[in-house]
């Protein structure tokens, strides 16, 4: 009986130990002067948004890119090659959120969630994204079902908090930073999966 228990425990260990910690893509961003963050992407909720982000990371689009906007207690925004909120990758993708007719994305905009920035047009997102800095009713009312949330910071929220606390905002109305914060590098581990983006 003792031998049977040992064998069963060994089998459980083998099956459990062989399982990957993550199946979803994991993005690692190195932020100059601040540190490293890791973001888990959620293709279950926003597959094309995730595919777009993965493709941009793999192309090196975000290397040397910046965070250009900070509204403390609200969002930190980046991903614009122009560094001023007007740029993008030269194309856009369809917005995967409920108010745009996409019903599979029920992610809420809570602390650490990453979501796509866009203009007034629902299908205008390209490369700009924002990270949510707090859990409030105002944030929920402003963003939930209106923007395509697609991932979450799973490591390094202390880095993001440090940016929120120490970066100097030049214009409190727009959130424009006095000095943009550089994303030195961004890499992604897709665990062998391929992600193909459909452009709008």
Give the positions of each predicted feature.
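Positively charged n-region of N-terminal signal peptides that target proteins for export
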Residues: 1-4
């Amino acid at each position: 009986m003792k031998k049977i228990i040992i064998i069963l425990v060994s089998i459980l260990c083998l099956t459990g130990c062989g399982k990957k910690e993550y199946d979803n893509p994991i993005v690692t961003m190195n932020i100059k002067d601040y540190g490293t963050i890791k973001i888990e992407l959620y293709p279950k909720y926003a597959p094309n948004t995730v595919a777009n982000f993965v493709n941009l990371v793999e192309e090196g689009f975000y290397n040397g890119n910046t965070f250009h906007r900070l509204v403390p207690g609200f969002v930190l925004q980046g991903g614009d090659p122009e560094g001023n909120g007007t740029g993008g990758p030269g194309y856009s993708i369809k917005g995967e959120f409920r108010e745009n007719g996409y019903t599979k994305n029920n992610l809420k905009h809570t602390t650490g969630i990453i979501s796509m920035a866009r203009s007034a047009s629902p299908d205008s997102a390209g490369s700009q994204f924002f990270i949510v800095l707090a859990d409030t009713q105002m944030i929920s009312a402003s963003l939930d079902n209106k923007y395509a949330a697609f991932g979450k910071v799973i490591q390094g929220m202390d880095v993001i908090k440090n940016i929120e606390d120490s970066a100097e905002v030049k214009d409190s109305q727009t959130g424009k930073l006095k000095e943009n914060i550089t994303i030195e590098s961004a890499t992604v581990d897709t665990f062998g999966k391929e992600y193909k983006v459909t452009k709008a």
